[in-house]
């Protein structure tokens, strides 16, 4: 399940920026063609090449959102039981994370990527690591923690007792 849709990506960053990010590989792509491809109907009579470019861009953003969602699940799986409810209190946060990481992913050229995009994506990756480690908890709409995976911690607890002060045992 993808945490975000192409329509939400466009709502967040605008049709023009989305087209610019995706047009890098599709020189025929325009904002109108991308909008039409997402809507599933064509305005006017675009050529077969223009339709193919728009459909390829639509497929690229859809695929990027799906792969980013799978990437996020890799972190979340260690902390919570998946899939999460779409009506969950975390849905907006996870959607925003997915969109920001996908934006960095489609900004794969130096003429598209900015330092700010990378910083935002790094912040979201750090947040995912915090969720995975348990430093950040996801909550339900009711304000309770999302069902966890039942982590078990093992190892020796730290002790301030000076065990070295005991004389060695003689057998």
Describe the function of each predicted region.
Residues 1-91, 151-171:
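Conserved short "hinge" loops at termini or chain/domain junctions
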Residues 27, 100-171:
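Short loop/turn elements at secondary-structure junctions
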Residues 8, 67, 93, 116-119, ...:
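Exposed alpha-helical structural elements
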Residues 90-98:
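Secondary-structure capping and boundary motifs in well-ordered enzyme cores
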């Amino acid at each position: 399940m993808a945490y975000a849709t192409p329509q939400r990506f466009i709502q967040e960053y605008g049709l023009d920026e989305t087209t610019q990010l995706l047009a890098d590989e599709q020189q025929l792509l325009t904002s109108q063609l991308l909008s039409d491809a997402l809507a599933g109907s064509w305005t006017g009579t675009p050529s077969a090449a223009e339709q193919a470019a728009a459909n390829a861009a639509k497929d690229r953003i859809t695929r990027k959102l799906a792969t980013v969602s799978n990437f996020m699940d890799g972190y979340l799986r260690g902390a919570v039981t998946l899939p999460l409810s779409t009506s969950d209190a975390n849905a907006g946060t996870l959607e925003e994370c997915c969109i920001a990481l996908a934006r960095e992913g489609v900004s794969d050229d130096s003429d598209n990527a900015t330092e700010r995009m990378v910083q935002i994506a790094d912040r979201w990756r750090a947040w995912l690591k915090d969720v995975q480690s348990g430093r950040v908890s996801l909550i339900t709409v009711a304000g309770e923690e999302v069902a966890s995976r039942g982590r078990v911690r093992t190892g020796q607890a730290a002790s301030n007792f000076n065990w070295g002060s005991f004389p060695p045992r003689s057998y």
